[in-house]
Structure formats: C-alpha cells, structure tokens
C-alpha cells in the first residue's frame, strides 16, 4: 500500500512539472532579476535587491544576454558587453548555450513561465529569476520604456 501511494505521488509530481518547449522560448525575452540561488549542497542565498538585471533578446533561438543596471527614472545603464546565446534541445531539455570571446558554457532551463524562470548550470547551481520591469520612483509622471 505504501509503495502504491509513493508511486502515485511521484506520478502526480512529475505530471505537474512542465517541460520547456520551443513555444516557451519567447518568454525569455525581457528583463530578469535573480530572486535566489541554490547551490548544489543546498545552501540558499536570497536576493531582495539587485544592482543589475539580465536582459535576454532571442529571435529564432539565437540572440544575446546583457547585464543592465536599473536607474530610478526607469531607464537602464548598459555597456557594450553581451553574451551570444543559442537555445538548443537535448533529450527534451532546453538549454541556453552562451558564448563570449573567452568562454563557452550552457545552462538548462528547468522552468519558464511569463514571470518566473529557473536555470541550472553544470555545477548544479539553480538560479531562480523573476521577470522585472523598469523602476520609476521619481514620480515625474513620465512613462518608462
């Protein structure tokens, strides 16, 4: 009986986990802020405020990721540094493949929705992101872009 309950629980748990598909990839576009990081040993680090966001732009499974710094007027400070990325699928797992002049690496997309994302690197570190929007606390009434 206990085995049956355990098997049913595992089945339900696995059914709740949605695989990331090619149709989900456009959800990557935009600004993402790290909420927490979970190391492979289980250590968690929570981020209540981030000085930089990750900006993803992807078209036809290729694009870039850039670090941007939000400003109080709703704009972002950017530089010329970016990482080329390509989305690939291996054994039903979606990966972001990064490439710079100095290194190559990839991260598995564990989950992806309109407002949440989890990436896992080769060291089994989990990066939990939330979708972000420009910050405008100046109260100047101007719309941010």
Predicted segment positions?
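Short, compact, well-ordered microdomains
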Residues: 107-127
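C-terminal motif of bacterial Sec signal peptides marking the signal peptidase cleavage site
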Residues: 12-15
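Short beta-strand segments that buttress and anchor functional surface loops
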Residues: 95-99, 117-120
């Amino acid at each position: 009986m206990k085995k049956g309950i355990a098997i049913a629980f595992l089945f339900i748990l696995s059914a709740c986990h949605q695989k990331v598909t090619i149709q989900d990839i456009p959800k990557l576009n935009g600004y993402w802020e790290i909420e927490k990081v979970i190391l492979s040993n289980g250590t968690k680090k929570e981020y209540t405020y981030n000085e930089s966001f990750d900006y993803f732009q992807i078209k036809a499974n290729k694009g870039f990721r850039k670090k941007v710094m939000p400003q109080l007027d709703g704009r972002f400070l950017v530089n010329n540094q970016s990482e080329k990325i390509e989305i690939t699928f291996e054994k039903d797992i979606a990966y972001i493949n990064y490439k710079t002049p100095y290194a190559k690496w990839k991260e598995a997309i564990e989950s992806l929705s309109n407002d949440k994302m989890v990436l896992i690197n080769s060291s089994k570190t989990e990066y939990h992101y939330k979708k972000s929007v420009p910050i405008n606390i100046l109260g100047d009434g101007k719309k941010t872009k």
